[in-house]
A protein has these predicted regions:
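Extracellular-facing segments of soluble proteins and assemblies that are Gly/Ser/Thr-biased and enriched
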Residues: 99-183, 189-192
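Short linear interaction motifs
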Residues: 64-68, 132-143, 249-259
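A recurrent domain-boundary module in secreted/ectodomain proteins
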Residues: 111, 279-327
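A short, polar beta-strand/turn micro-motif
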Residues: 55-102, 158-198, 288-297, 322-323
Length: 414
């Protein structure tokens, strides 16, 4: 009997993948149809290549959603021609943590840059009291909460509200990016408990404003000299204007000082370290917004510093093509194509000749494993309509009734 190598659908709706189909490869919004965004520049991610050690994400830094205007910001988004390198073997940095510097500290799933909470200015230019981008530059953010830097690099310091459905509080948020230490960045919602149990809840930060009446000390207890003092707290320099106005309290919230935690997620059923964006109950961004002042993991070279983000794709790298199939050992490819992914509603399915004449069972499930669609289909081109469902992650399962099945994780967004 022919032996099929097939993927199994677990009860918790996890997609078990080979090393070539892990989330750091499959979580990107690929532009497969030549779509353009701002300035008629190609949008989203142009290509994804991978080796056994790294993933190479090629992007213009222009999203697929409409951006602008930027009140009081004279900068114009431009093609950055980035090639970001994401390690496939992220690890905790057990030594001195690496600070998240100015400029890009990670990349959203659409190829747009992640910036930290700073806006590049500090009181008296000393780098001690650093301005928080949201209260100081927030007026220049567009409706998607992004804006361009002087070099034309469009970016988000805070929750990228147009990238995913941040109002969907009943499902675990999808991966919406990767930090440069290789760990995933999720949207605002996760499992109540880090072991993957409990309700879906909004992830709450452990940071809060300090109870201070002057700026003469730092949150870690450092007593400053008079020349290092920050400005008096008043209406011109209110508490919260500087990131040093915040302190981390371990007993608060779900997340650590890096704005993440070790936890189970839909894409990582065995657990991973994961960052989360933080918002309040009204979806207003909450400090530190994305990744904290330091990375949790070790940061490889190539993405930061002068010229960072312009890596060379190795000649032997494999290009990721957004079609997932099942290999029939010794007899070619038993393949199902599913596209586009992400989708704003319709998912097209195509079948290889191995399926000719077969009747198959189609199941579409949400992130909790609830079956939304179940029907018998012929092995011909099909269209699955998700337009009536909330944005989020879905799983398409196609079974042949003989023990083999095809699974594809689909991201639906607006």
């Amino acid at each position: 009997m022919k032996k099929l190598l097939f993927l199994l659908l677990t009860s918790s709706l996890q997609l078990l993948t080979s090393s070539a189909q892990t989330p750091e490869i499959t979580s990107w919004i690929l532009n497969t149809s030549g779509e353009t965004g701002y300035g008629n520049i190609a949008s989203n991610v142009q290509s994804v290549h991978y080796t056994t050690t790294d993933v190479y994400v090629s992007a213009t830094c222009i999203p697929g959603y409409d951006i602008g205007p930027w009140q009081g910001n004279p900068n114009t988004p431009a093609n950055q021609n980035f090639v970001f390198k994401i390690t496939r073997t992220p690890a905790e940095n057990t030594g001195t943590k690496t600070a998240t510097g100015l400029g890009h500290i990670g990349v959203w799933s659409n190829g747009v840059s992640i910036f930290n909470a700073k806006d590049a200015f500090s009181y008296n230019s000393q780098g001690i009291w650093n301005q928080d981008a949201l209260p100081n530059e927030g007026a220049s953010f567009d409706d998607c909460l992004g804006h361009p830097a002087p070099n034309g690099e469009y970016h988000h310091h805070v929750n990228p509200t147009c990238l995913y459905d941040d109002q969907n509080s009943i499902e675990h948020s999808p991966i919406i990016g990767y930090a440069f230490d290789g760990f995933p960045v999720y949207g605002a919602y996760g499992y109540e408990n880090s072991n993957g149990t409990g309700n879906i809840v909004r992830m709450e930060t452990g940071y809060r404003l300090r109870s201070i009446t002057d700026r003469t000390t730092l949150a870690d207890g450092t007593v400053l000299t008079a020349g290092q003092y920050g400005p008096a707290i008043n209406t011109t320099y209110p508490l919260g204007k500087y990131i040093e106005d915040y302190e981390y309290v371990q007993s608060l919230g779900h997340l650590d000082e890096y704005n993440g935690r070790v936890c189970v997620t839909p894409e990582y059923p065995s657990g991973t370290y994961a960052y989360f964006v933080t918002v309040d109950e009204d979806l207003v961004p909450v400090y530190p917004y994305t990744i904290g002042k330091y990375y949790y993991g070790t940061v490889p070279t190539g993405n930061t510093g002068p010229g960072g983000g312009h890596n060379t794709i190795p000649g032997g790298a494999t290009e990721y093509v957004n079609t997932t199939g099942l290999e029939e050992v010794g007899s070619g490819q038993w393949a199902v194509g599913s596209y586009p992914n992400p989708t704003n509603g319709i998912v097209n399915l195509s079948f290889s000749s191995e399926f000719a004449g077969q009747q198959l069972t189609l199941n579409v499930m949400d992130a909790k494993g609830a079956v939304l669609i179940q029907q018998q289909i012929a092995a011909t081109n099909q269209a699955v309509d998700l337009s009536g469902y909330l944005d989020g992650m879905y799983l398409i399962n196609i079974a042949d009734g003989k023990g083999a099945s095809f699974n594809q994780r689909i991201i639906k967004n607006r």
